[in-house]
């Protein structure tokens, strides 16, 4: 069982990326994170939500769901969409790979998430959507 959890969902508009980032940051604040820890989580959320909007829904309207749970000092963060899915997860997770080169995307989203979180798991099914499960243990003291 979790010590605390929250769920939000919102329309896949780029304007909502900052809402998602701030919402998760506010939830995580109960762990009294360092500024670096908080920045890491906000950056990972930003990348995950941006991926859902640009790649999952291809800038069409859909719903992005975020679930955040705390167990002890660990944050479990799930970002999910019902978009087009990822055809080849291994390829998509390679640094500098982008499925949208015409948009001048950097292809670093998954690399950023892996760098700033302790773990990243990607589940995806073509034409059904993608689910990212990220975890981070907070070392700061309450």
From Swiss-Prot:
Coiled coil: none annotated. It is an enzyme of class 2 (transferase). InterPro entries: Anti-sigma-factor_SerPK (IPR050267), Anti-sigma_F (IPR010194), HATPase_C_sf (IPR036890). It comes from the Bacteria. GO terms for biological process: asexual sporulation; negative regulation of sporulation resulting in formation of a cellular spore; sporulation resulting in formation of a cellular spore. Gene3D superfamilies: Histidine kinase-like ATPase, C-terminal domain. Belongs to the anti-sigma-factor family. Keywords: ATP-binding, Kinase, Nucleotide-binding, Serine/threonine-protein kinase, Sporulation, Transferase. PANTHER family: ANTI-SIGMA-F FACTOR RSBW (PTHR35526:SF3), ANTI-SIGMA-F FACTOR RSBW-RELATED (PTHR35526). It catalyses: L-seryl-[protein] + ATP = O-phospho-L-seryl-[protein] + ADP + H(+); L-threonyl-[protein] + ATP = O-phospho-L-threonyl-[protein] + ADP + H(+). GO terms for molecular function: ATP binding; protein serine kinase activity; protein serine/threonine kinase activity; sigma factor antagonist activity. Its EC number is 2.7.11.1. This is Anti-sigma F factor. Disulfide bonds: none annotated. Binds to sigma F and blocks its ability to form an RNA polymerase holoenzyme (E-sigma F). Phosphorylates SpoIIAA on a serine residue. This phosphorylation may enable SpoIIAA to act as an anti-anti-sigma factor that counteracts SpoIIAB and thus releases sigma F from inhibition.
